[in-house]
């Protein structure tokens, strides 16, 4: 097969590991900078062009769309889909998961546990918003933030009111969440491919920081997840419509709670922490799906 890896960063560990996994299974891997793609959108033969050449002959793509280019990245993935190319994560699911509020609403609809979350637009609703999530301490998140950036822990009601008011004054979209104190600055990252959790690790934030992101200095360690956590992680990915995703889970006194579903999860941290390859299952899943599509076409023909 010819597999395209949509990534702006060919030198990244994640990109290199995906290339290696494709090649080790006998496939041709092509790294494509998403932002360098341009499209011919028409009703007869839609196409994608790259560095002056039309991109043809691809069986599948693995989107690694950075949050900062979600709109353009999803357009490129959608164009590949229009050309009949299988996408490991499709454009609709990527866009769905990138909208943090929409993602939580989808989880809510499926009855999947999550921290109590509030969303408002008017400053005069702030006191009720704070009470809605159980009061201070609470977590305030920019909807556009990634990798722990734009996440604030407000220890008191006064601090919470000040931060929320400041964000709203800047016309920033924010959500307010209950603070799960018992998680103690840690979470569980589950790496899901299809309907399986292929690897999981516990991430612990640095001393004095409630955020556990490895990019912010957190550390990871192997962890054994419970059957409930495993089932919840897979259900959360399915709720988004994704195939490959990282699911962040908080362990609370009322059971596991989904914090976030990431459509382009980091690979380096979880592979080096667990010693498990998460890239091979991705390629194996693509092989299965592309073969099934070809078989269906043959039957129809």
From Swiss-Prot:
Free-text cofactor note: Binds 2 magnesium or manganese ions per subunit.
A GO biological process held by the record: SOS response
Chain residues that bind Mn(2+) 1: 248, 260
UniProt keyword terms in alphabetical order: ATP-binding, Ligase, Magnesium, Manganese, Metal-binding, Nucleotide-binding, Protein biosynthesis
Gene3D superfamilies named among the record's database cross-references: 3.40.50.20, ATP-grasp fold, A domain (3.30.1490.20), ATP-grasp fold, B domain (3.30.470.20)
SUPFAM superfamilies per UniProt: Glutathione synthetase ATP-binding domain-like (SSF56059)
All residue ranges annotated as the ATP-grasp domain in the record: 104-287
A Pfam cross-reference name: RimK
Named cofactor requirement(s): Mg(2+); Mn(2+)
Entry GO terms, CC: cytoplasm
Gene Ontology MF terms: ATP binding; metal ion binding; ribosomal S6-glutamic acid ligase activity
Binding site for Mn(2+) 2: 260, 262
List of residues binding ATP: 141, 178-179, 187, 211-213
The enzyme's E.C. designation: 6.3.2.-
Record-listed Mg(2+) 1 binding positions: 248, 260
Binding site for Mg(2+) 2: 260, 262
PANTHER family (alphabetical): RIBOSOMAL PROTEIN BS6--L-GLUTAMATE LIGASE, RIBOSOMAL PROTEIN S6 MODIFICATION PROTEIN
Family statement drawn from the similarity comment of this UniProt entry: Belongs to the RimK family.
Protein name: Probable alpha-L-glutamate ligase 1
Organism: Shewanella sp. (strain MR-4)
